[in-house]
């Protein structure tokens, strides 16, 4: 087993702090509307140019093994904030750096790290309460657009995101993809879509678009393979008498059952289309239940004692229209009971809150969106590959920020919400004493750091800006873009409360742990043996 290296006390803490500072200094130049960009080298392909804190943090590995541990801990702050809120990673990094710096300074001066950390935690709790109290709900397209525009530094992006969310609702799915044009386009799919197409091209009704379009169809949802036509005949007769098309969603449709459907379609006897059910295993069952609830039908399954040959029209789902291509099926305006659909949505939301798996969370989110209505796709294009990556990143961040704003509301941007939270922490200082008070004072000082950094990145004096904003009313702050002081909410400079809150909580969590560290254990880098020299082969 390889030996380990250790550092103790001040030496250990200083090494961690150097690592924290190196990462934070690389990230904080990007803060605010006049923040700069960072170029990231890639082993393969062109470099990435970005102003996204978490993307920069993820790329940083330091040579010194002890400093690197400090950098990796700070990286955790950015990553966690990104996971929870999707934005605010640079703010979180700036906050963590100042709490670590001030905390370690006080520990070196003799403060007890554990009591200090208690003070930090109490102050953060008060500040978070103050941020929540400042939050205002957002409604209307304009406010949604402003959140997106601030995050992406682009009004066009803000407007496209607002349009997408307006169409699919706040629970709907909005995907960001690479487009073929130079601008930003929005595509929208109404209704529920799943990624299974027709089982045979003979089902196509629109030859130009190669689509099977069924108007006002019945929908059979069967959790089984259908190959025996005798099982299907009683139901086919009922559907023919009703003079409506039929969509069959089953585990598979094959053999004579599939042949019968195709022959009847080609003869013009009656119109139908068969598709495979989406997903696999347990997830397939859940998705079939979703489709049944959306269309007002039942899942025909042997598990519940329901047999295909005994199925009645009343057990089938209905929809205004179904469009099937070779790759996917879209059900528009399912005839399900709105109350049942709402109940199912709430059930999925409850599952979302309890799941630990990112994969499950993504799949549940997809199911939720399909039930809640529609899928929007934002297609991002650019002149070069490098610009495309950067632009796509900004749109994804802006989308996350907008969702966070819809969830917990908005606060004044530009670091003002954090600065205003100082008042609540200031009141707490009177109740505390000793090292706890010192810990709370560290948070009090940290709350002004983001606004100071935004001002300095814009070429202004941070201390003067902080004093001026502190003396102002509610949401008056420094607009780094114009260089003036104004009502930031009215000017559209706003941040999601969730982003601001998460940035502070995650920064304090990691910084508090760093401050209480006394020993660092690290494994030295193994030296790679030199490559053997390639000499000439021997000759006879």
From Swiss-Prot:
EC class: isomerase
EC number: 5.6.1.7
Reaction catalysis annotation: ATP + H2O + a folded polypeptide = ADP + phosphate + an unfolded polypeptide
Intracellular or extracellular location(s): Cytoplasm
Subunit details: Forms a cylinder of 14 subunits composed of two heptameric rings stacked back-to-back. Interacts with the co-chaperonin GroES.
Keyword field contains Glycosyltransferase: no
Coiled-coil blocks: none
Family: Belongs to the chaperonin (HSP60) family.
Pfam families named in the record: Cpn60_TCP1
Gene Ontology CC, one term: cytoplasm
Positions of ATP binding: 30-33, 87-91, 414, 479-481, 495
Protein name: Chaperonin GroEL
GO biological process: protein refolding
Entry-linked SUPFAM superfamilies: GroEL apical domain-like, GroEL equatorial domain-like, GroEL-intermediate domain like
MF GO annotations: ATP binding; ATP-dependent protein folding chaperone; isomerase activity; unfolded protein binding
Protein's job: Together with its co-chaperonin GroES, plays an essential role in assisting protein folding. The GroEL-GroES system forms a nano-cage that allows encapsulation of the non-native substrate proteins and provides a physical environment optimized to promote and accelerate protein folding.
């Amino acid at each position: 087993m390889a030996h380990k290296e250790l550092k103790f006390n001040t030496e250990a803490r200083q090494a961690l702090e150097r690592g924290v500072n190196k990462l934070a200094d690389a990230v904080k130049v990007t803060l605010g509307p006049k923040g700069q960009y960072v170029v990231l080298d890639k082993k393969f392909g062109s470099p990435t140019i970005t102003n996204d804190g978490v993307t920069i943090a993820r790329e940083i590995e330091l040579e010194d093994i002890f400093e690197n541990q400090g950098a990796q801990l700070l990286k955790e702050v950015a990553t966690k904030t990104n996971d929870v809120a999707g934005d605010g990673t640079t703010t979180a990094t700036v906050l963590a750096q100042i709490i670590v710096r001030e905390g370690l300074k006080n520990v070196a001066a003799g403060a007890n790290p554990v009591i200090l950390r208690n003070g930090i935690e109490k102050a953060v709790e008060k500040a978070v309460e103050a941020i929540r109290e400042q939050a205002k709900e957002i409604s209307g397209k304009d406010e949604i657009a402003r959140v997106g525009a601030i995050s992406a530094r682009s009004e066009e992006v803000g407007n496209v995101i607002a349009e997408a969310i307006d169409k699919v609702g706040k629970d709907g799915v909005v995907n960001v993809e690479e487009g073929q044009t130079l601008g930003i386009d929005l595509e929208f799919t109404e209704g529920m879509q799943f990624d299974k197409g027709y089982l045979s091209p003979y089902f196509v009704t629109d030859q130009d678009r190669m689509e099977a379009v069924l108007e006002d169809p019945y929908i059979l949802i069967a959790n089984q393979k259908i190959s025996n036509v005798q099982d299907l005949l009683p139901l086919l007769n009922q559907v023919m008498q009703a003079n409506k098309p039929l969509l069959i969603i089953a585990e598979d449709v094959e053999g004579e059952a599939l042949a019968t459907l195709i022959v009847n379609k080609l003869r013009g006897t009656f119109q139908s289309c068969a598709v495979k059910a989406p997903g696999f295993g347990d997830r397939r069952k859940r998705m079939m239940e979703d489709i049944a609830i959306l269309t007002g039908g039942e899942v025909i399954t042997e598990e519940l004692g329901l047999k295909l040959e005994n199925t009645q029209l009343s057990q089938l789902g209905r929809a205004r229209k179904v469009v099937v291509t070779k790759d996917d099926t879209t059900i528009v305006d399912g005839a399900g009971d709105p109350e049942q659909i709402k109940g199912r949505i709430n059930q999925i939301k409850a599952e979302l809150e309890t799941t630990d798996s990112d994969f499950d969370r993504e799949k549940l989110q997809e199911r939720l969106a399909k039930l809640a209505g529609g899928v929007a796709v934002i297609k991002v294009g650019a002149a070069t590959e490098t610009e495309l990556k950067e632009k796509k990143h900004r749109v994804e961040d802006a989308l996350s920020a907008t969702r966070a704003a819809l969830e917990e509301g908005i606060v004044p941007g530009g670091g003002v919400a954090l600065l205003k939270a100082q008042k609540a922490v200031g009141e707490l200082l009177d109740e505390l004493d000793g090292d706890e008070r010192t810990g709370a004072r560290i948070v009090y000082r940290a709350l002004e750091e983001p606004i100071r950094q935004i001002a300095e990145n814009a070429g202004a004096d941070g201390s003067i800006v902080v004093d001026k904003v502190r003396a102002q009313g509610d949401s008056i702050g420094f607009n780094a873009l114009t260089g003036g002081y104004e009502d930031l909410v009215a000017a559209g400079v706003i941040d999601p409360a969730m982003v601001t809150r998460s940035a502070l909580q995650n920064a304090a969590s990691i910084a508090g742990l760093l401050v209480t560290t006394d020993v660092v254990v690290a494994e030295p880098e193994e030296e790679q043996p030199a490559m053997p020299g390639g000499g000439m082969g021997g000759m006879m």
